[in-house]
Amino acid sequence: MNYIHKYTTCIIQYLYIYIMISSAGMALPAYIGNDNFIILTLLMGIYYVLKKKTLFHLQKQYLLFIGCLFFSMLLVIIGSTLSLGTALSVTSIPLIIYATYKIDPANYLQRFIKLIFYIALISIILFTITRIYGFNSFSSIFPHLYTSFFRGGEVYSYGGFLYRFVTLHSDRNCGPFSEPGQYQCVLSSALYFIMFHPRLFEAKERIRYIIVFFLALITTLSTSGYIGIVILVFCYLLHSLKTIDKRMKYAIIITIIGTMLFMSMTKLGNEFMNTVVFHKIYANGQLDFSLNSGGARTISISSVLTTIYNH
């Protein structure tokens, strides 16, 4: 009976984790409808908040935070064109995160990392095949996959439950997400926990996870993902000076050296660097953050600052 309870709890938590990360841009919200997905996450979150009476002090503080977040969103809605659905959408995310953690706090991080690991492994394999044989090598299965909206006269993406074939980013690994930037956020989170929480897994498992997360992050060709890798590695090497985990430190150093050699000495690595760095901020011969996707970010930041200054 105890085994059945543990197994059921494990399955439920994996399901909650999948739905939790689906809110970051996977296909499930669009497949069942965004409004239905918001209602689903709210009900799932509320169910486990009310069902289990553990973590009382944490729950009291966290629910207070969610309540304050919801009412602050309502104040924004009153003075804008946003709807109540926006407030529910924003508050449903921290609620489902807390409920997922509360199901089994002791195994939450391990299961989160394992699920991301298998998603990353699948994405690396499928992305490698598309790079070798072409994006259309899977065209025969596209009609059987979930199709997203149309953009520029063609379907934006196919799939999205475990892997997504995104036509706009056919040369980048988006994982099950609609954009590589969304995917790198999840990968960077998993990489952080596996690097800075050594007690979660044995050393061999950690090395295996780190290598897969590194490879997946590199193939996203996400500038923010590359910046995240640099920051995580720099902080880890400083942190590891006080630890005795020599094997992990050497594994990361070897991975970094291998990545640098790949980027600098292979044609594919040079293409990656051109996509991530030069085409985004250095295309006109000088440093310019207004180019391509960098422009979308800097323009929005400058617009917000201008609005604050004028009002």
Give the role of each language-model region:
Residues 113-137, 160-221, 226-239:
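Alpha-helical transmembrane segments of multi-pass inner-membrane proteins
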Residues 125, 129-134, 240-287:
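A membrane-periplasm/extracellular boundary helix in multi-pass inner-membrane enzymes
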Residues 45-51, 76-133:
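Transmembrane alpha-helical segments and their membrane-water interfaces
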Residues 3-15, 53-67, 109-115, 205-208:
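Membrane-interfacial loop-to-transmembrane alpha-helix junctions, especially the N-terminal start
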Residues 107-116, 204-207, 242-255:
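Membrane-interfacial entry segments at the cytosolic side of transmembrane helices
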Residues 1-54, 70-77:
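N-terminal signal-anchor transmembrane segment
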Residues 19-26, 159-176, 295-301:
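Juxtamembrane membrane-water interface segments that cap and precede transmembrane helices
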Residues 286-311:
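TM-adjacent membrane-interface loops and short helices in multi-pass inner/ER membrane proteins
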